A protein has these predicted regions:
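Conserved donor NDP-sugar-binding/catalytic core segment of glycosyltransferases
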Residues: 1-33
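A recurrent flexible, glycine/aromatic-enriched loop bordering the glycosyltransferase active site
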Residues: 48-72, 84-85, 91, 133, ...
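Juxtamembrane C-terminal module of membrane proteins
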Residues: 148, 152-155, 178, 182-210
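Short, flexible, basic/aromatic active-site loop/helix in glycosyltransferases
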Residues: 20-26, 37-59
């Protein structure tokens, strides 16, 4: 895994980072397995600023679950931001891309990593995701995320129908609704009372440090 990530960075001039493909663990739920394959396909890719129209918000995607960075580019672009409730890896990758570097998705570097989040957990997680985007407009402004989320829902629905897992459709609707509700509120956290923010967040310690 490490060798493939290092090769992905070293063999692609201007690559500031490379991240691995995440495979579902044995206990991973059916719907989450599809989400893994949607977010981490079999084909590798190299993403740069020229790919914004093609990939949208996914151009900036990078996951610290398993990733390697070019030290020189990492330091030159400022490394990880000091304050981020979530998405520090994506903020770092987005900064690199905006400064003319690229990020590699190395599908041949594989790790097992997945979650079986409940709807409530998805709400909290996506609230923090929305907060991170609201706090870093220099990265996310003008690159909407909603379209990618809608595409995932549509693809997931089609997959459930094709495979005959109709009874999971209500779960898809519930989980997707909770994701969007959390994200919607997180993007607008500045308008919310502190008590509401603390009830919505997955990371109360972050707000206690603000």
């Amino acid at each position: 895994v490490i060798g493939n990530l290092v090769c992905a960075v070293s063999e692609n001039p201007g690559a500031g980072a490379a991240y691995a493909r995440q495979l579902p663990r044995a206990d991973c739920r059916f719907l989450e397995r599809y989400t893994r394959s949607f977010n981490y396909p079999e084909q590798s890719s190299v993403k740069s600023l020229a790919d914004i129209d093609k990939y949208g918000i996914k151009t900036y995607f990078c996951s610290n679950v398993c990733a390697a960075y070019d030290k020189g580019i990492y330091l030159k672009t400022g490394g990880f931001t000091e304050r981020a409730i979530f998405n520090e890896d994506m903020i770092c990758a987005g900064t690199m891309i905006q400064k003319g570097y690229s990020v590699v998705y190395a599908a041949d570097a594989r790790v097992y990593h997945s979650h079986n989040y409940s709807g409530k957990q998805q709400f909290h997680r996506n609230f923090d995701l929305g907060v991170s985007q609201a706090e870093h407009p220099e990265i996310f402004e003008g690159v909407p995320s909603e379209g990618e989320g809608i595409r995932l829902v549509k693809r997931s629905l089609g997959y459930l129908i094709r495979t005959g897992h109709f009874w999971l459709i209500p779960q898809l609707i519930w989980q997707s609704g909770m994701k969007y509700a959390g994200y919607f509120l997180g993007k607008r956290y500045r308008k919310l009372p502190r008590k509401v923010v603390l009830a919505c967040t997955m990371s109360p310690y972050y707000w206690n440090r603000k």
